[in-house]
Structures are given as structure tokens and as C-alpha cells.
Amino acid sequence: MRSKYIVIEGLEGAGKTTARNVVVETLEQLGIRDMVFTREPGGTQLAEKLRSLVLDIKSVGDEIITDKAEVLMFYAARVQLVETVIKPALANGTWVIGDRHDLSTQAYQGGGRGIDQHMLATLRDAVLGDFRPDLTLYLDVTPEVGLKRARARGELDRIEQESFDFFNRTRARYLELAAQDKSIHTIDATQPLEAVMDAIRTTVTRWVKELDA
């Protein structure tokens, strides 16, 4: 079986870290043990510096980061990660488990920020070509639930401090995109933890077994 790229998506507080652990456990039970883990933005020395710039409230002092500058920093970090980490890992037969990928930009910047969706799609295609995750698990929570969990973790980053309206628009775009793409599987992450974990196990197990069919 060829190596695959699995991405976990969702609003802040959706439970991506727990989901990643369940994905890893499930893959190991299916005999897949050669894995690497990525996060976006980040995952390389350059991408981590860009992460600090785009997410740290104090990184540029009082200067306002424009919406388009924000998008371009996300894509700069993303293409660096894809070309230097993800693609080489996949070529070597290693599975890649990612915390966020391009769907985040389409939802947060296209939905939350209201940036032209055609422009974002064009930019994605120019930067990434036809490279896409093989499977995306979208953990769906309301902003009220997700941000309550995020705030319980401690200090919020620049984007986590956006308004409920911003996150409602982001969630709506996530759901819209998930409905259009069969590779995106929506998990109701407002359920009790064990139910969410079971849903992830079932989804990943069924998907991997279909690869072997």
C-alpha cells in the first residue's frame, strides 16, 4: 500500500490533538507504523518563523497584518512544508499525519476573512498544483464549544481572539467545502469524547480497508 497523507481540521478547541492520537493508534492497529507528524503553519525552521509572525499578537508590534499578507504567509509556510517534508516522506513510503492544511486557509481566510474564494483557489493551485491530502477529518464544533475549550488551555493567539461571527463564517465555509469533497469526512466533535474517538476509528479503519479492496 502506498503511503498516504491524512489531515485533521477544525476550529480552535475541536480536539485535533486527541484526534491525531486516535488516528495514530488506529493506523498502528492496522499495521501502519512508519509515520511523521506535521502542523500548519510550521513544521520546518522557516515555516515555524512564519508561524510566529502570523499568529503571535506581538510579533509585528502595532502594525496591522493585512488579510492578503496573512494569506501569503500561510502559503509560504505551507509550500515550504510540503516540498521539504511532506512530499519527501510520502516518496519514502512514510505516512504523514497533519494538523491542518489548505482547507484551513479556504475556511478561515475564505470564510472568516471573506477573501475572494476564486482568488484563494487560484493561489492554492499555483502554489500546490494538484497536491491534496488523501483523507481529511474535519472535526465540527460550534464556536461556542470550541472557543470555550481553547480558552481553558490558556492564552489565545491572534486568530483565536477573533469574534464569534468570524468563527461562525469559518465553520460555515468548512461545512460547505466538506459537502463538496468526498475526501473530507465530517466528525461531530460536540459528542462525548468516547463517541468522537469511536467515529474517528471507524472512519479511518473503513477508509484504509477500502484502499486494500
Curated annotation (Swiss-Prot):
Query: Keyword Aminoacyl-tRNA synthetase on this protein?
Result: no
Q: Fetch the PROSITE patterns from UniProt.
A: THYMIDYLATE_KINASE
Q: Name the catalysed reactions.
A: dTMP + ATP = dTDP + ADP
Query: So what EC number does this one have?
Result: 2.7.4.9
Q: Which organism is it from?
A: Escherichia coli O157:H7
- Indicate yes or no for the key word Glycoprotein: no
UniProt keywords, alphabetically:
ATP-binding, Kinase, Nucleotide biosynthesis, Nucleotide-binding, Transferase
* Alphabetical list of CDD domains matching this protein: TMPK (cd01672)
Xref: InterPro entries: P-loop_NTPase, Thymidylate_kin-like_dom, Thymidylate_kin_CS, Thymidylate_kinase
Residues at which ATP binds? G10, L11, E12, G13, A14, G15, K16, T17
User: Which GO molecular function terms does the record list?
Assistant: ATP binding; dTMP kinase activity
> Entry's Pfam families?
Thymidylate_kin
- Protein's recorded name: Thymidylate kinase
User: Gene for this protein?
Assistant: tmk
Report the NCBIfam families cross-referenced here: DTMP_kinase (TIGR00041)
Query: Can you supply a Gene Ontology BP term from the record?
Result: dTTP biosynthetic process
Q: What class of enzyme is it?
A: transferase
Got a GO cellular component term for this one? Answer: cytosol
Question: What's this protein's family per the entry?
Answer: Belongs to the thymidylate kinase family.
